[in-house]
Amino acid sequence: LDQEVLDTQPDEVETLLIVLKEIDVKTALSKSKLRELDYSLNPYYGCQFSCLYCYARKFTPHEEASDRWGEVIVVKRNLVEVLLKEVQRVRRGTVGLSTITDPYQPVEGSRLLTRRSLEILLSKDFRVSIQTKSPLVLRDLDVLVRHRERVDVGFTVTTLREEVWRRLEPGAPGPKARIEALKRLSGEGIDTWLFMGPVIRGMNDGEVRDIIVLAGEIGTRIVYDKFNEYGISLGLRGDKGWWEAKEREILRSCEEVGIECHSEVEDWIHEERRRFLPLF
């Protein structure tokens, strides 16, 4: 990594003991159930960021990575070879990188599965939508800039407060590092977005205005979502009336700041607009 990327790394992230395992896979691309994506690609099972609210744990097919979330990371060692074959025969479309892991978690620094997959997909005229919490994505800035018309990058920003970040996302880079990386990407002309979620009542819901203002300063759009349990309990209780009021506040704030804003559920509409650009 160059010094600029190193300078955006978190200074004090909780250090967790990680067990790395390797497997061979038969497929690289999976049909996505999200309307805005055609495929998903997950280079790893498990995630070192260990976010307490993460739904991916429930949908991770590798039992040990799911049961020991944040401790066991499974590397798909033959992913690149499999992907090279798949892109020759599947229909081109939009690939989500990634949907049940963070593609730029620390193990990617040495394994390079995300970078190599990104190069393959973009060279074959697929579109790629990246979502991460890590400024390690800046390592691949050369690839992203070269193919900027076919890629977008979203950063999850759940909170701006250190105490909330450390509680909810103990292994993830801090919000400052994410925001600086988002600024850099946006400044390079890459389509960026800020995922403000999950919005959790009594924990980070008082920060939505501040995060929206920050997105406005960067010049990026907002995608938002509330906390959905998916079998995960944080000891919190939702309230339909609370969320309806909070969503109105989010939309009003985005309008006042002058940025595009939509819910996670509506994200497919934005992607449909992109589809009017030629895929071939």
What are these regions (language model features)?
Residues L79-L83, L113-S117, D140, A177-L182, ...:
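A general structural detector for well-ordered alpha-helical segments in enzyme core domains, enriched
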Residues L1-D24, S30-K31, M203-F280:
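Auxiliary Fe-S-binding modules of radical SAM enzymes
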Residues Y39, V95, V128-I130, V153-F155, ...:
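Hydrophobic faces of well-ordered beta-strands that scaffold small-molecule active sites
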Residues I100-D102, K133-P135, T156-L160, G197-V199, ...:
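Active-site beta-loop-alpha junctions enriched in small/polar residues
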Residues I130, P135, V199-R209:
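Active-site glycine- and acidic-residue-rich loops that bind
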